[in-house]
């Protein structure tokens, strides 16, 4: 019987650029579900369970922070790692 793989949801509008990181995690035994928008991330959280979520802050449509608030209503105990290129302290404090 195969061991359960930890499941990662990764939401980023530039997900194609993250392919090497996704492949690395998959090689380490993680199941990675990539999505390209905040709404896609919310929909996935409604349909599936995840062990951790990587969430880009700067996405078209819902921002990462807006998406985070919806995800925390659906799956309050799942850890979320906010990912951003921005060094604005206000974004870090809000997250």
Tell where the protein language model's regions lie, with residue ranges.
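Acidic catalytic/metal-coordinating carboxylates
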Residues: 36-40, 63-66
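Alpha4 helix (beta4-alpha4-beta5 surface) of REC/receiver domains from two-component response regulators
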Residues: 66, 87-95
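Two-component/phosphorelay signaling modules centered on CheY-like receiver
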Residues: 15-33
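Short amphipathic alpha-helix used as the core "switch/output" element in two-component signaling
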Residues: 43, 65-75
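Receiver (REC) domain active-site loop signature in two-component systems and cognate sites
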Residues: 59
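Active-site beta3 strand of CheY-like receiver
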Residues: 48-54
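Non-catalytic signal-transmission and effector/linker regions of two-component phosphorelay proteins
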Residues: 1-7
């Amino acid at each position: 019987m195969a061991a359960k793989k930890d499941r990662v949801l990764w939401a980023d509008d530039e997900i194609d650029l993250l392919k090497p990181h996704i492949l690395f995690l998959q090689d380490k035994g993680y199941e990675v579900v990539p999505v390209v928008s905040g709404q896609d991330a919310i929909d996935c959280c409604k349909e599936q369970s995840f062990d951790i979520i990587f969430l880009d802050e700067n996405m078209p449509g819902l921002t990462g922070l807006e998406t985070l608030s919806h995800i925390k209503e659906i799956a309050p105990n799942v850890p979320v790692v906010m990912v951003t290129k921005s060094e604005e302290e206000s974004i870090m404090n809000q997250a």
